[in-house]
Amino acid sequence: MCIRDRLYLIRAPEMTDVQHIYDRVAKIAEGAALMTETTVECRFDKACSSYLPNRTLENAMYRALSHFGTPEWNSEELAFAKQIQATLTSNDRQNSLNNIAATGGENGKAYALRHRETVLANEVAPYAATENVLAASTDVGDVSWKLPVAQCFSPCFAVGTPLHTWQLVSQGRTSIAHKGMLLAAKTMAATTLNLFIDSGLLQECQQEHQQVTDTQPYHCPIPKKVTPSPLK
């Protein structure tokens, strides 16, 4: 008996699209099995939901981030980041600035123009509530459909550094990354503190979340029949 395995990861901007594509892929597999007089079994591996933004909470987090501002970089950090930038292409830098421009509205475009030669971020990028899809991984997609969630970006590497590269890994244990993560931690802590202090803000976040989920209820993307599989 000959057995062949194939693993497919299906992604789309919305979960409804993912489900439609998954159903179609399953039918294609079933059709191929019929044509070749073989059998097929679809084994569900994993799934996660898209991120649901909460604009009220995002604004609160942005105010906290703006209060702290970007880290103070010393000469050694700037010199090292400049060495990293020297290994990047012009497209790498431009793609990084384009992402900022796409998520910051008109102010984001102006910010990108101002920082074409910046080595390490020295100004908080503008915030704008946009519907642009950011293709990135997150662990809080499903959580965001159960309660209000906000996310922020923090400067942990030289401007223009592409993700999943040796350049990013090289900066991961530097003081640059440590300062960036400390800023993120302070921002999250301050945002949480403000929610404890301002019950009205918390209520606004909850009301916004309720309004969205009333029309788009959460459905766990993992079928109920699926159980944890043995470790391989």
What do the PLM-derived regions correspond to, one by one?
Residues 4-232:
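Metal-dependent amide/peptide-bond hydrolase catalytic core
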Residues 1:
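Conserved phosphate-interacting/catalytic interface
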